[in-house]
Design a protein with these regions (language model features):
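Soluble ligand-binding/transfer domains with enclosed cavities or grooves
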Residues: 2-9, 13-158
Length: 158
């Protein structure tokens, strides 16, 4: 099975949970769009909404807003299985990263530029079917895990 996520343009629905130490898991949902405008160059946009109620005493150490916006711009050479990207994150600012495309997963890591807190992270997208991926993400600060996201990505359009 070849990858349909990232390697093909399309729109995906993400649904899962946000986890942070000392907090109950919180529902997260959103849209992920992949565009290929030029040969070898892709755009990857994520719009995610965090669902927590005011009564839940939600005291995240990381989330200051209930929406996350991530805009990637990346380069994947012809016949290559590795790519690089830059990323604009509405809470973290400017990031850079790289990724690998393996037969059954897409794995990437990123780091926040000019960050004294040494925040970085990784994401794994494991292919379940042609139109479904299991998504796992972790943000670290120094040697500590700050938060994780675990979700299912389902293709909604090509």
């Amino acid at each position: 099975m070849t990858h349909s996520f990232l390697l093909e343009p399309g729109q995906w629905h993400l649904k899962g949970v946000w986890c942070e130490s000392n907090l109950q898991p919180i529902s997260i949902e959103g849209i992920v769009s992949i565009l290929w405008n030029q040969p070898n160059w892709f755009s990857w946009n994520k719009q995610l909404k965090i669902f927590h109620s005011e009564e839940s005493n939600f005291k995240s150490h990381y989330l200051f807003e209930s929406e996350l916006t991530l805009t990637y711009r990346g380069y994947l050479g012809l016949q290559q299985s590795q790519y690089t990207f830059v990323l604009k994150h509405n809470l973290l600012g400017d990031l850079e990263g790289n990724g690998w495309i393996t037969p059954s997963a897409i794995i990437q890591r990123y780091w926040v530029l000019n960050d004294r807190k040494r925040r970085q992270g990784f994401e794994t997208l494991s292919q379940e079917t042609e139109n479904t991926y299991h998504f796992c993400s972790c943000l670290t600060q120094g040697h500590q895990m700050i938060n994780t996201i675990e979700a299912i990505l389902t293709r909604t359009s090509s």
